[in-house]
Amino acid sequence: MARYRGPRLRVIRRLGDLPGLTRKAVPSRRAYPPGQHGQARKKRSEYAMRLEEKQKLRFNYGLTERQLVRYVRRARRVSGSTGLALLQLLEMRLDNIIFRLGMAPTIPAARQLVNHGHVTVNGRVVSIPSYQCRPGNEIGIRNKENSRRLAEENLKFPGLANLPTHLELDKNKLMAKVNSVVEREWVALQVNELLVVEYYSRKV
């Protein structure tokens, strides 16, 4: 399944606010799923609820189904909570770190910054959005006028207001440091990760 490139408002009307996908919130007068029967009240099955939580992760972080399956498999190999490990793997992606630092308004915009070679990790250009950041990594913006201008403009209007505690940022130098792995309380997406793990329990 390919990465979604369609209308974002349609997605958030179905799934709720997805801070990584768009700054737009669900309009209160249209806070129901799209389509002819969007306003009909239905009792959702357990499968439908698990699927919805899985879709929140996929759309918020901009993943294909195949990519998400790989992350679930990696999370299962980590000791402790599989759901928490899954969220931490996704939150520590380079594109998400750039988004959480406020250097891009959304994760798709952050992915574009990384793809175009504007971002460095430990002083070297990294153009892979899925690069897994680790504690101790130094994240920066390439010392080029165009790169710095893009980041500086985005920092004026960050997608999320609060910088999570596992990151520190020097706005003047456009340099940041990953101090630790993200804690669950700092995951901005409202999602039940246990339902996601249950969704894949028989599929992966």
From Swiss-Prot:
Gene Ontology CC: small ribosomal subunit
Domain S4 RNA-binding residue range list: 92-152
Keyword field contains rRNA-binding: yes
Molecular-function GO term, any one: rRNA binding
Pfam families noted in UniProt: Ribosomal_S4 (PF00163), S4 (PF01479)
SMART domains named among the record's database cross-references: Ribosomal_S4 (SM01390), S4 (SM00363)
Keywords recorded for this protein, A-Z: Ribonucleoprotein, Ribosomal protein, RNA-binding, rRNA-binding
This protein's record includes keyword Zinc-finger: no
Gene Ontology annotations of biological process type: ribosomal small subunit biogenesis; translation
Segments for region (Disordered): 25-45
HAMAP family tied to this protein: Ribosomal_uS4_B
Family statement: Belongs to the universal ribosomal protein uS4 family.
Assembly mode: Part of the 30S ribosomal subunit. Contacts protein S5. The interaction surface between S4 and S5 is involved in control of translational fidelity.
Main function: One of the primary rRNA binding proteins, it binds directly to 16S rRNA where it nucleates assembly of the body of the 30S subunit.
Record protein name field: Small ribosomal subunit protein uS4
Species lineage: Bacteria, Bacillati, Cyanobacteriota, Cyanophyceae, Gomontiellales
